[in-house]
Amino acid sequence: MERTDGQLSAHSGTDKQHLLQQLFSDMLEDIYYAEKHLTKALPKMSKACTTGELRQAFDEHLEQTEMHVARLERVFGLLGRKAKARKCEAIEGLTKEAEDLKKETEKNTLTRDVALIAAGQKVEHYEIATYGTLVQLASNMHLNEVVSLLEETLKEEKAADLKLTSIAEHSVNWQALEAEG
């Protein structure tokens, strides 16, 4: 294969396909770790909420996250593999940031809920980006059943993000401003 700079590429088409499959596998293990990690982090976020509406959103997303873990285990099975988690530094950092925000805000305040929404949305955006990439890679590899499962999770992650946006825009942010003002 030729590179655009005129040099021969060190990788053949088969090697490049293998590299993409390896990237897909690594990302799958990464998001599996992330989802399992979130099953422990979401209850802490829920417990820290001031408003019932936000607590309910985190509780509902915990239920979905448990389904995401099971769905990923099905994906691994479809690929003929045992589910394997690969430490996800991104989710570790995002959940640590959520813990830090919780410590930096006063308990039972709407300001804490604003911080928790921001932290939750950062997690959702990471998941949306990861699942979006996984869907595209699986599609390119013609893994149709895998695509369907990953698209289902992607749709749920986007809905969770929109729910947090709605809670922020329609109640928590305004209430926090009024409480501070």
Regions found by a protein language model. Name each.
Residues 1-181:
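Amphipathic alpha-helical hairpins
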